Amino acid sequence: MDSKKHKIINGYYHKNCISCKSWLPATEENFYSVKKNKDGLHSYCKACVLKKAKESMLKNYDKQLERMRERNLLPGMKEAKKKYNSSLKKKKTQQIWQEKNKLKLKNYRLQRDAHKKHNITDVQWQKCKDYFNNKCSYCGLKIEDHKILFKGTYIQSDFHKEHVDHKGANDISNCIPACKSCNSSKHDFAFEEWYNSSNKNFSSERLLKIKEWLNRFKEERQDSEWRTKG
């Protein structure tokens, strides 16, 4: 294992982004999948990949226009020119708007990212996993069997902090443990739209356990509201 790029933190496998130098859990939540890489993950974290792509697009804008002018001399390119110019104008207009609305975009990204990550403590997360017997709440996979591929070898990785309701809270009340496979499969589907009898991993017992976990927080909130009103 390359200690400069990979290491174990708190018992779980982490990877260092070569761009921003941040140590992040080596999962597809933080890195894009790249099959040709030995660990199956991009060398840059997702945030840096998007940043580099934007910088490249802005840097090469003039070169794109020059190549377009050369192609305009070819037969049948007049109509293609109209479509391409329209596309570039839209992109340029979008870039101008982005430059004028940096603060608005920053706030939007913060709000978007806030709904991607859970704001829970390590203790809360461990209690959550303990409640589900350290198994994926959807398929029942044991955490010791939850592994990712690195240099041809499977090594243990932590479960994903799954948003049951993607538009719901970012705290422990909307969090359950999910393996990589179930997390990817569920994506943005509504909970019971995805987790039902048509799902090969469905279990009525696991469904009941998930609902019991979520309901305990609903009851706590209701009790708190009742005491406040009282």
From Swiss-Prot:
Pfam families: HNH. The keyword Hydrolase applies. CDD domains: HNHc (cd00085). Its EC number is 3.1.-.-. Residues 136-188 form the HNH domain. One of its GO terms (molecular function) is nucleic acid binding. SMART domains: HNHc. It comes from the Bacteria. The keyword Nucleotidyltransferase does not apply. Keywords: Endonuclease, Hydrolase, Nuclease. Belongs to the HNH nuclease family. This is SPbeta prophage-derived putative HNH endonuclease YoqL. It comes from Bacillus subtilis (strain 168). The gene is yoqL.
